[in-house]
Amino acid sequence: MLREALRIGNRRWYSYKSVRRPNLGATGTPKMEPPKEQPEASSKAESGHGSLAKQLRAKILSTGPIPVAEYMREVLTNPQAGYYMNRDVFGREGDFITSPEISQIFGELVGIWLVSEWRKMGSPSPFQLVELGPGRGTLARDVLKVLTKFKQDAEFSMHMVEVSPFLSKAQAQRFCYSHQTLPEDAQLPHYQEGTTASGTKAFWHRRLEDVPQGFSLVLAHEFFDALPVHKLQLVDGKWQEVLIDVASSDGAQEASFRYVLSRSQTPVSSLYRPLPGETRSCLEHSLETERQVGLLAERIERDGGIALIMDYGHFGEKTDTFRAFKQHKLHDPLVEPGSADLTADVDFKLVRHIAETRGNVHCCGPVEQGLFLQRMQGEARLEQLLAHALPENQEIIRSGYEMLTDPAQMGTRFKFLAMFPGVLAAHLDKYPVVGFS
């Protein structure tokens, strides 16, 4: 499959023309195709930051300190002032940039990986391409190109799991020929639908549970790092939860927050049970990650399919990773809530443990992003693009791929983990999963 996809010759198999992605070293600001709604939405978001801080302050003063997870959820997804809800936060002009935005090679190789493993499973049809938290839709668009080219006679549909009305429209503009938002009283499992230029149907859902049953190829790129985490600390042999309180209660207009240690057991600290071999005295634990991974595992066991999780993270050794990013720089997560992205590294040890205990699922990885892309013949694809690129674009293409694979940049920090039906374990041992071995 890889040789077929990466063949270089007169027919230029799979040699789409290079796409001009942002030059990260340039002093000028590249155009990133912002959705038309951006100016109005951005203004709305800016005006909401102060009100969100006041809402959080009022809640804390009335009910007491809140878990970091509750703070994180409210800051990111508050319907009126949540960070993701009303504006474009991606790219050079946003607060962070993701791998698919840096280089088309990323999405193309992910697409080739999906096709390769799908074919090894017998090319079931119809199937679903599902993405959790699709961002701008760049990864979905790049993978769509690959699937459309190599799906043979198979039929498939696209299903995006997205809570942000703003981002769902941006995604539809990215890869759909036409799209529409459905009435609120439609009583359907999706709230938006569209059709791509190649005729593929696309649907938007607010929850993974709303995606129809069926064989699915599931992508989760920088999805789990945005899920709320609880911060726990071991004190005198007992786990206590780190909470967020107001810095003062004197009625000051300027809302300010601080971390405090719970005075007594919270529901999370009382129920938390560390994984075998746990040695940390402080850690971050995501109940929402447990829930989402459990849903994925149950779906794969029941319906068949593959899930590929791509995110920055660790294997159960890090302690304090909760942080904020604003305009590509670290930012205090307790200052101006709603104005910056909140994130925490994914605990891949927890992800793998939940997947393998909640369902009959076989996991591969995690492996480092740089290693995965190299094993997927990323250098060969890079040379293809360079050979057909304009001279002024060659350094942009080369530096983008270097950023994805360089150990000092994104190559080791980002990890890939794959989930397969457990019944395929022996088959996958005999025919190793490309990119993971």
Swiss-Prot record:
Catalytic activity, EC: 2.1.1.320
EC category name: transferase
Gene Ontology BP annotations: methylation; mitochondrial respiratory chain complex I assembly
Disulfide pattern: none
PANTHER family xrefs: PROTEIN ARGININE METHYLTRANSFERASE NDUFAF7, MITOCHONDRIAL
Role description: Arginine methyltransferase involved in the assembly or stability of mitochondrial NADH:ubiquinone oxidoreductase complex (complex I).
Protein name: Protein arginine methyltransferase NDUFAF7 homolog, mitochondrial
